[in-house]
């Protein structure tokens, strides 16, 4: 694109302006079309135990998808974009947090901090994946480098890390800003 950065930014801003702010009607539709199927699947899973665990596990797949959709609504509540009312956002976010096992207020504050400082090497160590500069990496000893490389391995980043984050860190928020 040959446009200067400020012109591209202005163009982008105008392009997304219609999507700014909350639309209460649309938000309620999204909430209902996420929560009702989730609870229906939850009930069906409970009833399916009489048939067999295989059916319960099969129903768990779409239930997990609807739970993920509910987490996305919780995310939008945390960003202040789902309802105009702060009380409505916080109420819905809290209730969904009970279902997703993600404490809403803690997550909202730490996620806002993450967005404010993500990618800024002067504000590392909270809400992000630890990142070292080349100079910092080279200054580590052999075991430090091995540990850092193990930490950055996809198995750790995408399996062990999220499990630790959701099962431990959300239960013991010792590093909340």
Question: Each PLM stretch: what is its role?
Answer:
Residues 2-64, 99-109, 117-177:
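Non-catalytic, topology-defining segments of multipass membrane proteins
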Residues 15-20, 51, 68-73, 85-89:
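Short amphipathic alpha-helical segments, especially helix-boundary/capping motifs
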Residues 67-86, 107-119:
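Acidic (Asp/Glu-rich) catalytic motifs at the cytosolic membrane interface
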Residues 62, 76, 95:
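Short glycine/serine/threonine-biased micro-segments
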């Amino acid at each position: 694109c040959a446009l200067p950065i400020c012109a591209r930014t202005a163009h982008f801003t105008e392009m997304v302006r219609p999507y700014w702010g909350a639309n209460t009607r649309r938000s309620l539709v999204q909430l209902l079309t996420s929560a009702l199927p989730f609870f229906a699947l939850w009930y069906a899973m409970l009833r399916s135990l009489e048939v067999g665990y295989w059916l319960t596990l099969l129903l768990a797949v779409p239930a997990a998808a609807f739970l993920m959709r509910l987490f996305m609504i919780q995310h939008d509540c945390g960003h202040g974009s789902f309802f105009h009312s702060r009380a409505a956002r916080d109420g819905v976010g809290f209730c969904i947090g009970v279902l997703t096992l993600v404490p809403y207020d803690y997550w909202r504050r730490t996620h806002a901090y993450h967005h404010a400082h993500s990618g800024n090497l002067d504000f590392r160590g909270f809400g992000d994946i630890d990142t070292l500069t080349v100079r910092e990496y080279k200054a580590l000893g052999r075991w430090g480098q091995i540990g850092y490389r193990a930490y950055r391995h996809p198995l750790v980043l995408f399996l062990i890390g999220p499990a630790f984050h959701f099962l431990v860190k959300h239960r013991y928020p010792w590093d909340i800003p």
